[in-house]
Amino acid sequence: TAIMVGVNTVIQDDPLLTCRLENGENPIRIVCDTDLRTPITSKIIKTANDIKTYIATSSIDESKIALYRKCGCEIIYTKKKGNHIDLMNLMQCLGNMQIDSLLLEGGSAMNWSALEQQIVDEVQIYIAPKIFGGSAKSPVSGQGVAFPNDAIMLKPYAFSQVGNDYFIESEVIYPCLQE
């Protein structure tokens, strides 16, 4: 099992991405970082010698790569799609490494990229019964779609209340696969 984030999440939140359960096993950590901007001082890099950590990148900057390797990170070279990592290519690389289960703990840009490149099979959503409106952050940013028929559909299969929040698990149905 692995957990994946984008470089912006590392820069903004400095997560550790470890298991919080007593005697739990830490997931493999994957940072999608097209241009190698992950701070060497981040928690994820500082703990890379103890917890398997991959940096997925399109960069060939050997001096930066050497710094990450010195900290214990392994590098996954991926193709580029536009200005970002080709996530489908990354999924193929991870599959070749026997990593077949992945939790995307992404920010809105990473979430959109993953949905746009159709690498998401299911989503787990927590919804708080609050309305923010205005310019509040959204869980998915990016280009979006112009027409309702082009929207990515969610087919819920589990729904529960957790405290005051709602938890929904859904299968992702992409437009070309909709009935």
Feature-to-residue mapping (PLM):
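Enzymes that bind and transform nitrogen-containing heteroaromatic metabolites
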Residues: 1-179
